[in-house]
Amino acid sequence: MSHQRNPRALLTPAMHHVLERMARAPHLPMHALTAQQARAAYEAGAGVLDIPPHKLARVEDLAIPVRDGSTIAARLYAPDHAPLPLLVYFHGGGFTVGSVATHDSLCRHLSHLAQCAVVSVDY
């Protein structure tokens, strides 16, 4: 079967295995959960596909001040102490699931590969 009819034909055997494991997992789909249940399920499974975290020159938790006097939590990742280009990262999750913590390894990886600073915004 061609990949035009079956996009999974292009996947590596390792990715096929990951998808099979996900399909067998005894979890309800996210849309069937309350927001609180979805957050807990996401947090519990966030590390399953994690890549080993890169060691970076800077990893720093920030509190970014905003107009109303409150702050927005964020985390800065940088492979060097020199001035660098900046990527602002907003994790997915529909404003319901995900956090700076669940995307820590990914942001470290992005910073390392792109040789730029990454600010991951927590919301």
Predicted regions span which residues?
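Short amphipathic alpha-helix adjacent to the substrate-entry channel of hydrolases
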Residues: 101-121
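A glycine/proline-hinged amphipathic helix-loop "lid/cap" segment
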Residues: 1-72, 76
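Active-site donor-binding loop signature of nucleotide-sugar glycosyltransferases
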Residues: 66, 92, 123
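Short beta-strand element of the alpha/beta-hydrolase
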Residues: 74, 83-93
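Fold-independent oxyanion-binding glycine-rich loops
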Residues: 74, 121-123
